[in-house]
A protein has these predicted regions:
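Bacterial N-terminal signal peptides that target proteins for export
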Residues: 12-23
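Signature of exported/secreted
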Residues: 33-343
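Bacterial N-terminal signal peptides
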Residues: 22-32
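Serine/proline-rich low-complexity intrinsically disordered segments, especially terminal tails, linkers
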Residues: 4, 24, 118-120
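Short, Lys/Arg-enriched N-terminal segments with co-localized hydrophobic residues
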Residues: 1-13
């Protein structure tokens, strides 16, 4: 599983200044000239805008498949090779209308471009017969080209969401998340090169699935499409749904370097994650099945689907120390374990 969000780099960056202290100074004097920590914070200026482009890529390969009946694994299963790939691209432009402490008070987000593509390649051999199948699908979102305003409600401790101009499509707003700035990866206090801090694992949902549920739907209904990646963003829930708030494990960040590049001051943050999640996806699948067109004479009775996965990854966040926003981010992950059980 690979996820590589790539926000646009900002060329308007601050020149760096470094302070050097002689090691020969006596202790009391040295204490007065300790190098200050870096303020790696999210604080864009009010009225400014930022364009961000994310690209998430995922590849799954089948390791083992079994069918059980009355608790017993059925013999004579065919040999099967299967690979599923999924690519999602998200482009937005955020206008920071009003800023609060560490987050916007009011944010206007325009969805510039939303696209999703999936493909599946399967080869099955049984009783000397070979059957090869290749499928591909695309998904789109009604949010594409629209503008959503996020307004912080201090009493409710949440963002209120509304279309601009107003539209009666509340279902599209329900799963949207305001944070597409990767704020979960930033330190709470000043840090020096080499300092580490712990990342709230549950907050990684906004990093792995930026923007929340973007309401992708298949462009065309495909008969028998149940197997197309188990609906990863193609009509059976988004990656945000699969992760939700059930993430467990650990995640750490480290200030690896503060450097100058083309006259810019950049903070380089190294990120490592080891996470796991268990999710009952039954309700999402049942809702998706209502819209599935089955071949004539075919009926499917669905009981449940559970997803269990473990993931490890490393990444690098480069932070613009002048505009106090993302310069770039790349995260590579791999599934140590992914099990899907359904009946």
């Amino acid at each position: 599983l690979c996820a590589a969000p790539r926000p646009v780099r900002d060329p308007n960056l601050m020149n760096a200044k470094h302070l050097f202290v002689s090691a020969a100074l006596i202790a009391p004097v040295l204490a007065a000239f300790v190098l200050p920590g870096e303020k790696v914070r999210f604080a864009p200026a009010e009225g400014t805008s930022a364009t961000k482009n994310f690209e998430n890529k995922m590849e799954l390969t089948l390791d083992h498949m079994a069918i059980t009946m009355n608790g017993q694994e059925m013999p004579g299963m065919p040999e099967m090779d299967m690979t599923i790939t999924h690519t999602q691209k998200v482009g937005v432009t955020d206008e920071f209308v009003a800023m609060g402490d560490g987050q916007p008070k009011k944010l206007k987000r325009h969805f510039d471009a939303l696209s999703s593509e999936s493909s599946m390649s399967m080869k099955m051999e049984m009783m000397g017969q070979s059957n090869d199948q290749d499928h591909s699908s695309e998904a789109e979102s009604e949010l594409d080209g629209k503008t959503v305003v996020f307004t912080w409600d201090g009493e409710a401790k949440e963002f209120k969401k509304a279309f601009d101009p107003a539209e009666d499509k509340a279902d599209l707003l329900k799963g949207l998340m305001e944070d597409m700035d990767l704020r979960a990866l930033l330190p709470e206090n000043e840090v020096k090169v080499g300092d580490e801090w712990t990342i709230d694992v549950k907050s990684l949902v906004d990093v792995l699935a930026p923007g929340g549920d973007l309401s992708f739907k298949p462009k065309e209904k495909e008969g028998g499409g149940m197997g197309m990646g188990m609906g990863m963003g193609q009509g059976m829930g988004s990656m945000h749904d699969y992760l939700s708030d059930l993430l467990e494990g650990e995640a750490k960040a480290k200030l690896g370097d503060v450097r100058e590049e083309d006259g810019a001051k950049l903070a380089v943050i190294k990120v490592t994650i080891k996470i796991a999640s268990q999710k009952d996806m039954s309700d999402l699948v049942k809702d998706a099945m209502k819209d599935q067109e089955m071949p004539q004479g075919m009926e499917i009775e669905f009981d449940h689907m559970d997803v269990d996965f473990k993931m490890e990854g490393e990444g690098e966040l480069v932070w613009n120390m002048k505009t106090n926003q993302i310069a770039s981010f790349e995260l590579s992950t791999r599934c140590v374990w992914l099990e899907i059980q359904y009946a």
